[in-house]
Amino acid sequence: MKKLACLSLALTFLAVAAGGAALAPAPVAAQAKTIVWNLPTVAAPTYYHTVNYNAFAAKLKEKSGGRMEIRVHPASSLYPGPELIPAVLDGRSAVGTVLASYLTDVLLEMGPLELPFMTSSIEEHKKAALQLRPFYTEMLAKKGLKLLSINTWPSQQIFSSVPIRTVADWKGKKIRVYGADSANVTRLLGGSPVNIAFGEVYSALEKKTVDGAMTSATNAEPMKFFEVAKFLDYWYLAGAAQEWLVANQKAWDGLPKDLQQAVMDALKDSNLEEKEWQDAAAAEERTRKRLPELGMTIVDPSKEEMAKARQIAKAAWDTWLQRTGPDGKRGLELALQALGR
């Protein structure tokens, strides 16, 4: 009898224990894992792009309650410049930047505003770029990309070891370029284009591999180009150079709806797009004043030389139209319409 009582007590204990276990919270084998997207950029760690992307990332972490993070990788530390577009196209990067500097046949039609001498200021470029948003959205969607934000670099100038004041001064000069259009206009103006990744510009100027480098004047200080080039030639080859922040569409579709909304809210609350254009204009103005302090000489070609260069560069537009087909033609028409021409 005693044995039966003990057995009954033991069974009761086991039943209670089992029930308690069922009521206890299940061990969190793996709490919902934080979704991490890596965002590569060619911009230096202190450059406004990097600062703005980090602010956007911080806002996203806040909006998602820590469920999603974007980690910014500056100064080509994740992928070199020419790899940025392929990386987001093939999904190695769920989020990335499409730089006008690296547009290829894959997305060349995105660049009507990047044609040589199309715009002459950041303000003019911005006005047209924002009107072209539906066109950009459509072109990116064709390649499996979702447009998040239209951003910009400042105007494109020439760092050089000798002054380039006239069209004649371009003759025979080896100029670092960053894509098909900049290569074409350099050739038309009499120079020899050399494709060099952004991260290699400093050493190319230092070793005299090139006589000059086409890029934004605002890179003088953060990239220390002032150490290896003594002249900044203000040819305004482009009033600005766009950078589109995009997501790989498959990666985007894989996000829960609330996280998609968190991304859009973070873009809005960080004011990323507007901040980019404001910072570009401020950086350009600040750089112009700063260059002499860095020991650089500013070269302003005459109006006559600029007009001559623009006329010569028109041939580059024809080449671009031939390569981009109907989409390019439509994009150019939209760009000219937006600019009131």
Predicted regions and their residues:
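Short, low-complexity disordered leader/linker segments with a strong preference
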Residues: M1-V36, R341
